[in-house]
Structure formats: structure tokens, C-alpha cells
């Protein structure tokens, strides 16, 4: 729980706008037909990263705290911490641009095509005015 609080503090670090084409999705809706100009924001990324870093901590709170301290004190932690912070910033950005549901393909932080993680299909729907 303290770890989540620690990570939430990194949400206030400035985040650069993600111009271009961005697929907002999760592991159950993999992106398709990505272009060189497109990028992916994994909305389940923070949880998946934390799970991969911390694994299954012990049920005993004292032992779990010790395990977490060992991870946080490891030489790999600064890089892992930055990865988690970046993943949270991307999720916050999705919320800031008003993303209502996912998967979605967002063009220039303005136009969203919901219900697909396929960049080509989203571009076609967008060019047809959503018809």
C-alpha cells in the first residue's frame, strides 16, 4: 500500500503530450497494424509492471514488508521505479484527454476511435467520419 502511494507521487512529474497515433489498450486487446508513427499505452501496464517486479509477496505483513524493502534497495530499483512512474503517467494522460473506454485509437490527442486496437481500421473509420 505504501508502494502505491510512493508511485502516485510520481504522477505529478510533468508528462509530455503524446502527439500522433496512440493505441490505448490492455493485454486482452493487443494492438494491431501499428505504424512507425504510432505508439501503445498499456492501461494495465502499472499493475503488470508491479506484479513482475514484486511478484507475490508473503501473506505475513512483516515478511512482505521485508521483501518489498529488499526490492526497493536493490540496484535495479531506480530503473524499475521510473518504468512504473512512466506507466502511471501514461494512464493519467489517457484520463486527462477524456478517454471513456478502451481499447481506443487516439489521433493527435483529439480524435478517438473506440472499440478497436487496430490502427488501420481506426484510421479508416476516422476518415469516413465514424460511419
Predicted regions and their residues:
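Sec-dependent signal peptide recognition
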Residues: 2-11
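N-terminal signal peptide c-region/cleavage motif recognized by signal peptidases
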Residues: 14-16
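Local sequence-structure signature of Cys/Sec-based thiol-disulfide redox active-site neighborhoods
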Residues: 18-58, 107
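Extracytoplasmic/secreted cell-surface and envelope-processing proteins
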Residues: 32-33, 113-115
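Aromatic- and Gly/Pro-rich amphipathic surface segment
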Residues: 55-85
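Thioredoxin-like thiol-disulfide oxidoreductase module
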Residues: 76-100
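A short, hydrophobic beta-strand/beta-hairpin element that forms part of a small beta-sheet core
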Residues: 102-113
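C-terminal partner/receptor-binding element of secreted or periplasmic proteins
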Residues: 115-131
Amino acid at each position: 500500500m505504501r508502494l502505491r502511494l510512493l508511485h502516485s507521487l510520481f504522477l505529478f512529474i510533468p508528462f509530455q503530450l503524446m502527439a500522433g497515433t496512440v493505441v490505448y489498450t490492455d493485454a486482452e486487446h493487443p494492438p494491431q497494424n501499428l505504424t512507425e508513427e504510432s505508439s501503445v499505452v498499456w492501461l494495465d501496464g502499472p499493475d503488470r509492471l508491479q506484479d513482475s517486479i514484486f511478484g507475490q509477496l508473503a501473506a505475513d505483513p512483516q515478511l512482505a514488508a521485508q521483501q518489498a524493502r529488499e526490492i526497493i534497495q536493490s540496484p535495479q530499483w531506480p530503473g524499475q521505479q521510473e518504468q512504473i512512474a512512466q506507466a502511471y503517467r501514461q494512464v493519467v494522460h489517457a484520463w486527462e484527454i477524456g478517454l471513456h473506454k478502451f481499447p481506443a485509437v487516439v489521433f493527435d490527442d483529439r480524435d478517438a476511435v473506440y472499440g478497436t486496437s487496430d490502427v488501420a481500421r481506426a484510421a479508416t473509420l476516422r476518415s469516413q467520419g465514424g460511419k
